[in-house]
From Swiss-Prot:
Its main location: cytoplasm. The gene is proS. It comes from the Bacteria. Consists of three domains: the N-terminal catalytic domain, the editing domain and the C-terminal anticodon-binding domain. InterPro entries: aa-tRNA-synt_IIb, aa-tRNA-synth_II, aa-tRNA-synth_II/BPL/LPL, Anticodon-bd, Anticodon-bd_dom_sf, Pro-tRNA-ligase_IIa, Pro-tRNA-synth_IIa_bac-type, Pro-tRNA-Synthase_IIa_type1. GO terms for molecular function: aminoacyl-tRNA deacylase activity; ATP binding; catalytic activity, acting on a protein; proline-tRNA ligase activity; transferase activity. This is Proline--tRNA ligase. SUPFAM superfamilies: Class II aaRS ABD-related, Class II aaRS and biotin synthetases, YbaK/ProRS associated domain. The keyword Ligase applies. It comes from Streptococcus pyogenes serotype M1.
Length: 618
């Protein structure tokens, strides 16, 4: 395809509003353009990459018997009222009315629609299982769209739904999807982990997230590609090397979620769901009497600990939440942080929000900084992290401004429900006892759920089982963020390309090093001088030969300076660059492998054979 015929509006500079490298490069390389806040147009290059990813998905889903269909994006609100999500989904749901004043939504996901379609068509267990999916635009009214395609108001998603007559059958399909997702993301060239995930608004029970890992840009050998003019990093002057490190550091922010994983086992989980090895300890110290002490101007745990000369691990942090309009007290060891997802899941709450200062004062009789679990009103619900029950003679707020209590002992002085509600910390033991936890940043690219009967119960989707009994259909749900795949791939495959000019100056610029499977084209064929007829003829022949061998070819036929062509080529990021330059009359062309920066001159007649050898090596 001729580059002059495509819309590829590259920019000379990084966009000033971009915060992550994937967003910056997608805009600068002419892949996407923002139409309005959180809404993007996918230009030809991005669209080709997305279509290649769709092909990979379709091939893998066919292997597990998943069937593609297409549901509407505009949905009646009545279906969501049936499931109960119309009221509970939150402000992210796009709600609208038609000319008849009927309520509709723009679908952020399609559980209700697929459940209804199957409910109306399937009556017997003999018609199951069903395994359906679609690839479609979804809509979510994000309060603060950000990070390019990672947090948008319109996005492309693959959402699949399976329907079963029992949980054993669901387990089989769930495992099929897990393996299919691993195959898809592996083929897409992603470094990823399957981790324990949170079902969230989807209503799932068991779930697994697939996270594309986005490591820090500190390893020069990974993130920097040297031109053939530079033999090694050792040849780069120290001051230039420091500039390169600074450029990498400028784009260090990467990923949207933190994951915790074991250094010695397969354990991995989203930070929201991660836990650590816990060993209860028996109390050995005698319990002191409760005592009220004045702690003037002490509002935080560290201030209280310093004032009373105790370690923060001997203090109790007391928080108040409102869960579905009911107050809940949460307790932590003083140096720990609350994990609101764990707390919300334990409470099985639809809504969980921190209480306001006014609400806290009404409940405790004191303001923030002086709250504690002792002498609360009868019937108060207290949920404490499991570490709290190991404390002896702890310090907690006295529910009196400017005062705390010492000698606080769980069990004697208050009763609580003990459960894991804290955020894990790096370096703690993995919950399986093998290795310690390390943190990494990542981008969620896929999520699979065992929905069970969450939707079939609320929407009356039932079948007759083998015994003639009416039972709810058991469901699974399987999503892939198609548009965010583009961001994830670029986050992992962005590279800083460094070259040395004939005058000895060092220059560097960001570009993309697309994996072959997702690159919009396989080969970037560049004619240095489009006015040279010999070069033009050779380019045309090479283009035809490459296409005949199955290569997707982007031919740069523009009448532009060669420097601009090479800069655009680095930006666009195709795996192979073939340059028809000054030696065209001799039948000599240059091949450059983008991943390594290696280049070689070959006779044009040997181009295909050489490419086959080089691509096998890389």
């Amino acid at each position: 395809m001729k580059q002059s015929k495509l819309l590829i509006p590259t920019l000379r500079e990084m966009p000033s509003d971009a915060q992550v490298i994937s967003h910056a490069l997608m805009v600068r390389a002419g892949y996407v353009r923002q139409v309005s806040a959180g809404i993007y147009a996918y230009l030809p290059l991005a669209n080709r990459t997305i279509e290649k990813f769709k092909t990979i998905m379709r091939e893998e889903f066919e292997k597990i018997g998943a069937v593609e269909m297409l549901a509407p994006a505009l949905l009646t609100a009545d279906l969501w009222r049936e499931s109960g999500r119309y009221e509970t989904y939150g402000e992210d749901l796009y709600k609208l009315k038609n000319r008849d004043n009927s309520d509709f939504i723009l679908g952020p996901t399609h559980e209700e629609t697929f459940t209804t379609l199957v409910r109306d068509a399937v009556k017997s267990y003999k018609q199951l299982p069903l395994n359906l999916y679609q690839i479609q635009s979804k809509y979510r009214d994000e309060k603060r769209p950000r990070n390019g395609l990672l947090r948008t108001r319109e996005f492309i998603m693959k959402d699949g739904y399976s329907f079963h007559h029992n949980y054993e059958d669901l387990d089989v399909t769930y495992e099929d999807y897990r393996q299919a997702y691993e195959a898809i993301f592996t083929r897409a060239g992603l470094d990823f982990k399957g981790i324990i995930g949170d079902g969230g608004a989807m209503g799932g029970k068991d779930s697994q997230e697939f996270m594309a890992i986005t490591p820090a840009r500190t390893d020069l050998d990974r993130w920097v590609v040297l031109d053939k003019s530079i033999a090694s990093m050792d040849d780069i002057p120290k001051e230039v090397l420091e500039d390169i490190k600074a450029e990498l550091a400028a784009w260090m922010i990467s990923g949207e979620d933190t994951i915790a994983y074991s250094t010695e086992s397969s354990y991995a989980a989203n930070l929201e769901m991660a836990t650590n090895e816990y060993k209860p300890s028996s109390k050995v110290a005698a319990e002191d009497a409760l005592a009220e002490v004045e702690t003037p101007h002490c509002k935080t745990i560290d201030e209280v600990a310093a004032f009373l000369s105790v370690d923060e691990t001997q203090t109790i942090k007391t928080l108040l939440f409102v869960a579905d309009n009911e107050p809940v007290v949460a307790l932590l060891v003083g140096n720990d942080h609350i994990n609101t997802v764990k707390l919300k899941n334990y409470l099985a709450a639809d809504f969980l929000e921190p209480a306001s200062e006014e609400e806290a004062r009404a409940f405790f009789g004191a303001g923030f900084g002086s709250l504690g679990p002792v002498n609360l009103a009868q019937g108060s619900r207290i949920v404490a992290d499991r570490k709290v029950q190991n404390l002896t003679n702890a310090v907690a707020g006295a529910n009196k401004d400017g005062f705390h209590m010492t000698g606080v002992n769980p069990g004697r002085d208050f009763q609580a429900e003990y459960v894991d509600i804290r955020e894990v910390k790096e370096g703690e033991m993995s919950p399986d006892g093998h290795g310690v936890l390390q943190f990494a940043r990542g981008i969620e690219v896929g999520h699979i759920f065992k929905l069970g009967t969450r939707y079939s119960d609320s929407m009356g989707a039932t079948i007759l089982d083998e015994n003639g009994r009416t039972v709810p259909i058991v469901m699974g749900c399987y999503g892939i963020g198609v548009s965010r795949i583009l961001s994830a791939v670029i986050e992992q495959h962005a590279r800083l390309f460094v070259n040395k000019t004939p005058k000895g100056d060092y220059r560097y610029a960001w570009g993309i090093n697309f994996p072959k499977e997702l690159a919009p084209f396989d080969v970037h064929l560049i004619t240095v001088n489009v006015k040279d007829q010999v070069a033009q003829d050779l380019t045309a022949k090479l283009e035809a030969d490459l296409m005949a061998k199955g290569y997707d070819v982007l031919t740069d036929d523009r009448n532009e300076r060669v420097g601009s062509k090479f800069s655009d080529s680095d930006l666009i990021g195709l795996p192979i660059r073939v340059t028809v330059g000054k030696k065209a009359a001799e039948g000599i062309v240059e091949i450059k492998i983008k991943a390594t920066g290696d280049s070689i001159e070959v006779n044009a007649e040997n181009l295909i054979e050489t490419l086959e050898i080089l691509t096998k090596e890389h």
